[in-house]
Amino acid sequence: MVKLGNNFAEKGTKQPLLEDGFDTIPLMTPLDVNQLQFPPPDKVVVKTKTEYEPDRKKGKARPPKIAEFTVSITEGVTERFKVSVLVLFALAFLTCVVFLVVYKVYKYDRACPDGFVLKNTQCIPEGLESYYTEQDSSAREKFYTVINHYNLAKQSITRSVSPWMSVLSEEKLSEQETEAAEKSA
């Protein structure tokens, strides 16, 4: 804490330190604003372009002007359009990042539950693992394997024979016999 009552005016006189718990630090007097301001100049000289023009008329040597070639794709475009294009590019970039993250999650971070094994980016039961290892990984082989399984399944289906088939076949035979008899007669 600071003991009040000290000032810069008392700078030369040192008082003995009192052991009352206060430090005797001289307080600063308020700063006068008039001390900070400089008086305004009597005359202000502002040089304009017209003061430099007579130099050229007098024939003083100046470096030749070099034609500037600038291409501006934003010339004549409103600020609103510029901001819209910037936002569009930012959204496209963020969309690409999101798709990349989603792809990585589905492609590489696949964990199968207990009792399943990851084969060809699919979780299959451990009991069927030997069935899937017999198949080749190429697309043509997979296609032919599917067709062969379809043919085997089709052959294993028992065909139910209609009781009317024998009657219809006998009827067709009798019709053919009557037609043959009519043609011969």
From Swiss-Prot:
Transmembrane segments annotated in the record for this chain: 83-103
Family matches, as InterPro entries: NSG (IPR009431)
Cytoplasmic compartment spans: 1-82
Gene Ontology biological process terms from the UniProt entry: amyloid precursor protein metabolic process; apoptotic process; clathrin coat assembly; endosomal transport; neurotransmitter receptor cycle; neurotransmitter receptor transport, endosome to postsynaptic membrane; positive regulation of receptor recycling; postsynaptic neurotransmitter receptor cycle
GO molecular-function terms, A-Z: clathrin light chain binding; ionotropic glutamate receptor binding; signaling receptor binding
Keywords associated with the record: Cell projection, Cytoplasmic vesicle, Endoplasmic reticulum, Endosome, Golgi apparatus, Lysosome, Membrane, Signal-anchor, Transmembrane, Transmembrane helix
GO cellular component terms, A-Z: dendrite; early endosome; early endosome membrane; endoplasmic reticulum; endoplasmic reticulum membrane; endosome; glutamatergic synapse; Golgi cisterna membrane
Compartment(s): Membrane; Golgi apparatus, trans-Golgi network membrane; Endosome membrane; Cell projection, Dendrite
Lumenal side: 104-185
Coiled coil: none
Tissue-by-tissue expression: Widely expressed in brain and spinal cord. Expressed in neurons during maturation and synapse formation.
Keyword Repeat among UniProt keywords: no
Required for GRIP1 interaction: annotated segments: 129-164
Annotated Pfam families: Calcyon
Membrane topology recorded in Swiss-Prot or TrEMBL: Single-pass type II membrane protein
S-S bonds: none
PANTHER family, per the entry: NEURONAL VESICLE TRAFFICKING-ASSOCIATED PROTEIN 1 (PTHR28546:SF3), NEURONAL VESICLE TRAFFICKING-ASSOCIATED PROTEIN 2-RELATED (PTHR28546)
Subunit structure: Forms a complex with GRIP1, GRIA2 and STX12; controls the intracellular fate of AMPAR and the endosomal sorting of the GRIA2 subunit toward recycling and membrane targeting. Interacts with GRIP1. Interacts with STX12. Interacts with APP; could regulate APP processing. Interacts with FAM171A1.
Biological function: Plays a role in the recycling mechanism in neurons of multiple receptors, including AMPAR, APP and L1CAM and acts at the level of early endosomes to promote sorting of receptors toward a recycling pathway. Regulates sorting and recycling of GRIA2 through interaction with GRIP1 and then contributes to the regulation of synaptic transmission and plasticity by affecting the recycling and targeting of AMPA receptors to the synapse. Is required for faithful sorting of L1CAM to axons by facilitating trafficking from somatodendritic early endosome or the recycling endosome.
Family stated for the protein in its record: Belongs to the NSG family.
Protein name (record): Neuronal vesicle trafficking-associated protein 1
Natural source organism: Rattus norvegicus (Rat)
